[in-house]
Design a protein with these regions (language model features):
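Basic, amphipathic alpha-helical bundle interface domains used for macromolecular binding and assembly
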Residues: 35-46, 61, 68-78, 284-285, ...
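Walker B catalytic acidic pair
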Residues: 295, 301-303, 313
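Peripheral, non-AAA+ core regions of ATP-driven protein-machinery
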Residues: 1-214, 218-225, 326, 461, ...
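Short beta-strand elements
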Residues: 19-25, 278, 380-383
């Protein structure tokens, strides 16, 4: 027959929708037409496919060739459909058997020599193909990435000739080579940080409840060092989380590595990063730093040095856990459930309240004014990281507990949250907070007075209750007590700083 149907996969956010490649050969003047909303890069595949077939000693049909990429309303980009188009032409012209095509999917860009080149976003295609119950053929260079999904049927090839021989039953294509398991680098330990017991305690609370955390302090007090220790006290990714995180990295051009498969991502963009770099975008939308940090930690150092509009673009993803990028032709949705950790100096000169301040209160307020109130409201804990007292470095320094000891408490608290809430405390909505974070009348009155004194919002009320619930979980308590509220209120360093500046 002069009609062939081949399956492939597009790339749309973290999804890989099926694309049906229909190839029809008809009589008439020789031509090669492509329909189905192909972009320029896809239209260019006509020349690549023709050269690849001729250089592979195949016959290029002297007929009117029509290639339809369905569905027509799905934009197609890149060279990922080259292999499927070439296979369709060969099957329609009866140069290869077509009986096995419907059980397979094909992904890969063709070189003029017939070599199959790697493409981006293979991991989402592997997951989608597994769910569809088909075997996916990918370029050999994409094999190690595809091998991460162990229950998927995947084959790899380096040349078009090998694929055609496999479809004809003359050759067995290899399975993807599994990645060599890398030896994970030693995770930095919290015992490396001298002193700063309150900041370490805040880090433990943040890890247990997945709360957003802001460190405030002069230069050189260990803010960045503390933040880099957070992944070491977090639990590993579940299989589902690991697959979703790796799929995002695959789309972003970051090849997931076997040794880091269940390791939570830790992203540290520079303060000169644009809004597109942070939240994602582009003419062909790609994930930004907040999506690459999905299920992990996003650390923003020197927070006031970021553009205000860049930081404000994080407000919605912090609440919803995803980011929608709208373009004229489509909308793309990327997951962005990350834990935000920020670090900043309390003033332009870096110091405040330690006798080294060179900035006036008005200068400090202007400096802090670079951060909008709604953005600061997204931090559950804001902690002061002061200069170490004299003698801390020369004497016997207080190192505190190891990351492993703290991690065990974090895992226990998370188990308690998941068994009670089915989710972590930072994800509790207002109705769940009323049920799970109930206070006695005396404690409720105490908290309300504290909120009014600090001039905090209703959002801050909810965040304090969530943090108090996490503190109670770490202590193994069933109910929130006044001591937990007092500790949670102690992690409002930014509110106290602003209050002191405005009053004096």
């Amino acid at each position: 027959m002069s009609l062939a149907v081949v399956y492939s996969r597009a790339s749309l956010g973290v999804a890989a929708p099926q694309v049906t490649v229909e190839v029809h050969l008809s009589n008439g003047l020789p031509a090669f037409n492509m329909v189905g909303l192909p972009e320029t890069s896809v239209k260019e595949s006509r020349d690549r496919v023709r050269s690849a077939l001729l250089n592979g000693n195949f016959e290029f049909p002297s007929k009117h060739i029509t290639v339809n990429l369905a569905p027509a309303d799905l934009p197609k980009e890149g060279g990922r459909f080259d292999l499927a188009i070439a296979i369709g032409i060969l099957a329609a012209s009866k140069q290869i058997p077509a009986k096995y095509l419907l059980d397979h999917e094909f992904l890969g860009e063709l070189a003029l020599t017939g070599e199959i080149r790697p493409v981006l976003g293979v991991l989402p295609a592997v997951l989608a193909c597994r769910d569809a119950g088909r075997t996916l053929l990918v370029p050999r260079e994409n094999g190690p990435e595809a091998s991460l999904i162990q229950d998927a049927e995947v084959r790899t090839a380096h040349q078009l000739l090998a694929v055609t021989a496999w479809l004809a039953g003359q050759y067995e294509l290899p399975l993807p080579d599994p990645q060599t398991t890398d030896t994970l680098p030693e995770v930095p330990d919290l015992q490396d940080v001298i002193g700063q017991s309150q900041a370490k305690r805040a880090l433990e609370i943040a890890a247990a409840g997945s709360h957003n955390l802001l460190f405030i302090g002069p230069p050189g007090t260990g803010k960045s060092m503390l933040a880099s220790r957070l992944p070491g006290i977090l639990p590993p990714l579940s299989e589902q989380e690991a697959q979703q995180t790796a799929a995002i990295h695959s789309i972003g051009g970051l090849t997931p590595r076997a040794g880091h498969w269940h390791h939570r991502p830790y992203r540290t963009p520079h303060h000169s990063a644009s809004a597109v770099a942070l939240v994602g975008g582009g003419s062909h939308p790609r994930p930004g730093e907040i999506s690459l940090a999905h299920n992990g930690v996003l650390f923003l150092d020197e927070l006031p040095e970021f553009e205000r509009k860049v930081l404000d673009s994080l407000r919605e993803p912090l609440e919803t856990g995803h980011i929608t990028i709208s373009r004229a032709a489509r909308q793309v949705d990327f997951p962005a459930r990350f834990q935000l950790v920020g670090a900043m100096n309390p003033s332009p000169c870096g110091h405040y309240g330690d006798g080294q301040t060179r900035s006036s209160p008005d200068q400090i307020l202007r400096y802090l004014g670079k951060l909008s109130g709604p953005f600061l409201d997204r931090f559950d804990l804001t902690v002061e990281v002061p200069l170490l007292p004299k003698g801390s470095l020369t004497g016997k320094a207080e190192r505190g507990e190891s990351s492993q000891q703290i991690r065990e408490r974090v895992l226990g608290a998370r188990e308690q949250m998941l068994s009670r809430n089915g989710k972590l405390n930072n994800l509790l909505d207002s109705r769940e907070i009323e049920e799970i974070c109930r206070l006695s009348p005396q404690d409720a009155e105490f908290l309300e007075n504290a909120i009014q004194k600090l001039g905090l919002s209703i959002r801050a009320w909810h965040r304090i209750l969530r943090v108090s619930r996490t503190i109670a979980d770490l202590a193994g308590r069933q109910a929130i007590e006044k001591e937990h509220l007092i500790e949670a209120l102690g992690y409002r360093a930014m509110d106290r700083l602003l209050s002191r500046l405005r009053s004096g």
